[in-house]
């Protein structure tokens, strides 16, 4: 074969290979286009499960442990449209308290990523209940948990997570920078109140649906503070109480009316011989009832009730079953402050039913241990110490702490009344235990008109942790 023939032969072979390659590329493009068309046609699949509409997009591997679901729209039997929480229902009749949640945060935090917290509380919208809490900007069993016994620091923040879940960086939502806080839902959005700053000039930052709407400056320049539990929304307006002034003497107490995050009215209570801190508030037939902590001189709890115009009445729970800690043995009550063991105190709550009252309190008279609910059928107005029933929820040998009220509106429960509920903080660590940190978990209960049980639901963590050794 002469050189020209070789050149022609090699060129022909190259041309054939090129044509074959081109055909393969065209086939590949056609195949990809057909495959993409099929996937696009089947990308959205809508299924009905018990009248709940669930839309899945992208790939779902049902027969494997890993499920990749993104861009998911779930409507599970709840109307997600906004409503106005009326707050005009009366409290549901109840016979006792059923366990609602327990997060086991400290137990889980010995090995998992769980926030160091205190002052947890629960608040519900018409769609869900969330646990709010004040973090210390640190995780359990980590070096930054050292010294978290301190109440006020620039690292503290109000965050929230689904009720019953341990508060971690993976399930929690930032709400506000705060070392004192409150939050509530009016049916259209979340109002959060976060207080931060120096003791002599702290500022409360109000947010509505995450956007700053108002600020309130400390007016007495002596540790402005608020409820550490939920505020109350009635017919589109939300209400909260703040305190500014001494913790062991007369201070200043203000009620604020807030609409969509903006203060529309406020009044200062005329209470020269009373002390109101860390109030636990709830709606009842369009009014607001708050039961508070007297840290000055009362071992029974002060209360204030007000309407939407902020016209108020005030007093102390009269019962000889005393609700604060420390406190004397049950005995003769008073409709004013009971001065015996009246100094200091702990956040707590009660629910009024006519002349009767459900009193939540520690089981110990002198330390934050144990927790019980007591029904005194005449305790709101009478001073004797007789009561009808008692339900134990934390044993006296186990640690408790703050407690507070929250309600579930008819728009959430479907009932025709306001369901009363409460939470209990289970404090662990310093100053009572040999750790470098202070944190806690929480339990909660809701009132039911059916059978309940006495038991103890303690924190249950085994201390010290690795970081403490």
Swiss-Prot record:
Record's catalysed reaction(s): Hydrolysis of alpha-(2->3)-, alpha-(2->6)-, alpha-(2->8)- glycosidic linkages of terminal sialic acid residues in oligosaccharides, glycoproteins, glycolipids, colominic acid and synthetic substrates
Protein keywords: Calcium, Disulfide bond, Glycoprotein, Glycosidase, Host cell membrane, Host membrane, Hydrolase, Membrane, Metal-binding, Signal-anchor, Transmembrane, Transmembrane helix, Virion
GO biological-process terms attached to the record: carbohydrate metabolic process; viral budding from plasma membrane
Bilayer disposition of the protein: Single-pass type II membrane protein
CDD domains: Influenza_NA (cd15483)
Listed cofactors: Ca(2+)
Enzyme class (EC, first level): hydrolase
The protein's Enzyme Commission number: 3.2.1.18
Intravirion side: 1-6
Residues binding substrate, per UniProt: 118, 152, 277-278, 293, 368
Places the protein is found: Virion membrane; Host apical cell membrane
Any Pfam family the entry gives: Neur
Transmembrane in keyword set: yes
Regions of this protein lying in the Virion surface compartment: 28-469
Glycosylation sites: 44, 50, 58, 63, 68, 88, 146, 235, 365
Miscellaneous remark of the record: The influenza A genome consist of 8 RNA segments. Genetic variation of hemagglutinin and/or neuraminidase genes results in the emergence of new influenza strains. The mechanism of variation can be the result of point mutations or the result of genetic reassortment between segments of two different strains.
Domain characteristics, as noted in the entry: Intact N-terminus is essential for virion morphogenesis. Possesses two apical sorting signals, one in the ectodomain, which is likely to be a glycan, and the other in the transmembrane domain. The transmembrane domain also plays a role in lipid raft association.
Protein name, as recorded: Neuraminidase
Organism: Influenza A virus (strain A/Hickox/1940 H1N1)
Highest classification ranks of the organism: Viruses, Riboviria, Orthornavirae, Negarnaviricota, Polyploviricotina
């Amino acid at each position: 074969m002469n050189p020209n023939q070789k050149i022609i032969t090699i060129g022909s072979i190259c041309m054939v290979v090129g044509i074959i390659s081109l055909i393969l590329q065209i086939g590949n493009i056609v195949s990809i286009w057909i495959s993409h068309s099929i996937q696009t046609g089947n990308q959205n699949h809508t299924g009905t499960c018990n009248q709940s509409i669930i839309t899945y997009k992208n790939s779902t591997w049902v027969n494997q442990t890993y499920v990749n679901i993104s861009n998911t729209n779930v409507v599970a039997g709840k109307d997600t449209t906004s409503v106005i929480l009326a707050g005009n229902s009366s409290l549901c009749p109840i016979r006792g308290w059923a366990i609602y949640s327990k997060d086991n945060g400290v137990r889980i935090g010995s090995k998992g990523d769980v926030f160091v917290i205190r002052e947890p509380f629960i608040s519900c919208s018409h769609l869900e209940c969330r646990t709010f809490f004040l973090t210390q900007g640190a995780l359990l069993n980590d070096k930054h948990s050292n010294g978290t016994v301190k109440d006020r620091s620039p690292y503290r923040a109000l965050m929230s997570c689904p009720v019953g879940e341990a508060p971690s960086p993976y399930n929690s939502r930032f709400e506000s920078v705060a070392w004192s806080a409150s939050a509530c839902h009016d049916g259209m959005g979340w109002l959060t109140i976060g207080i931060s700053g120096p003791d002599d000039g702290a500022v409360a930052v109000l947010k509505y649906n995450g956007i700053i709407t108002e600020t309130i400056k400390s007016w007495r320049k002596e540790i402005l503070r608020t409820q550490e539990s939920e505020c109350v929304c009635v017919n589109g307006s939300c209400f909260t109480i703040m305190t500014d002034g001494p913790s062991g003497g007369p201070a200043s107490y203000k009620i604020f009316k807030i609409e969509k995050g903006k203060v529309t009215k406020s009044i200062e209570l005329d209470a020269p011989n009373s002390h109101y801190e860390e109030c636990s508030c709830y709606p009842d037939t369009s009014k607001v009832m708050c039961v508070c902590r007297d840290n000055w001189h009362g071992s029974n709890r002060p209360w204030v009730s007000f309407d939407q115009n902020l016209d108020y009445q005030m007093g102390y729970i009269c019962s000889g079953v005393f609700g604060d800690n420390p406190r004397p043995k049950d005995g003769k009550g008073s409709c004013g402050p009971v001065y015996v063991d009246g100094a200091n105190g702990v956040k707590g709550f009660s629910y009024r039913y006519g002349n009767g009252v459900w009193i939540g309190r520690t089981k110990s008279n002198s330390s934050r241990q144990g927790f019980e609910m007591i029904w005194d059928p005449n305790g709101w107005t009478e001073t004797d110490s007789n009561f009808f029933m008692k339900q134990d929820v934390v044993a006296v040998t186990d640690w408790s702490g703050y407690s507070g009220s929250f309600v579930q509106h008819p728009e959430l429960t479907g009932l025709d009344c306001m369901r009363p509920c409460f939470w209990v903080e289970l404090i662990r660590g310093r100053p009572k235990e040999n750790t470098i940190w202070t944190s806690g978990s929480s339990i909660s209960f809701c009132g039911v008109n059916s059978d309940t049980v006495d038991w103890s639901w303690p924190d249950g963590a085994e201390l010290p942790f690795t970081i403490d050794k």
